[in-house]
């Protein structure tokens, strides 16, 4: 997404004052400050740029109490998944945890998204700025908010920006993010989830494609044969981005940065590392995440001592769904095709232990069938 011009970031349209809901509020009722003070410097004392972060109860929560009640458990606010995985890999050393906290504050916290950073302004991670001159957006605009943050993977997959890979079939049907990812999911439900795949009201393909197992479906036999054995993406997604070896730090001016050793487009089927009642499938698509034992080494020489406790190939739900794909063109396009599956040779020897439960041994690759 293109950065906004300086004046665009702060311009408030007079039309906002005519809003029958939010326009009736004085600026100070959300942002603080003293409108009665004739001195502009002292009048701005206590002014808050984003009244909805880190606590929305005194701003949005005054009217939207039912949503603000669950605010802190929304993964967009809590970033619980990042805390969980980094602390699991790091261990319990207090000094290391303190250094990790500094690293998270410098790098991870910029990815949170508050009420305001979806409904009023762009997220801070893309330099912020008002969306529509401070007019509240009930439905956050997809390209200025959703893909502004979820750009390198989701946007490129969904819009077909990866070379040689077509866009998601749902994009061709003009679906926006909220068609699958509802407000209820985004706002949280009060439960402290460890990652997005645990969210109870998260999207499921079957929510819309409920007929695929019925006799009326032309592919009912294939869908029933593979039910609970494969995730939908195993058959219906295309190659997606996999990143490697991310390292974070600060430059000479104290500005946070990150760099990786690159990325590749690939497609791999692995053993489900998060198999549960909600996701019972044995085989799922897996994506390589760019964590490295020395990702946070810049900060007090942190090394992720328990690196092998979690895989570097994680459960993935790529946003490049197609009805027909190379792997579902025929049965034996997948059956007996070991190259589609995450094998021992796809993983560096030093990461073999971390991915032991995800790697598909040769004997588990489905054999060829008579077609």
Per-segment meaning from a language model:
Residues 1-126, 135-371:
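C-type cytochrome heme-c attachment and multiheme electron-transfer modules
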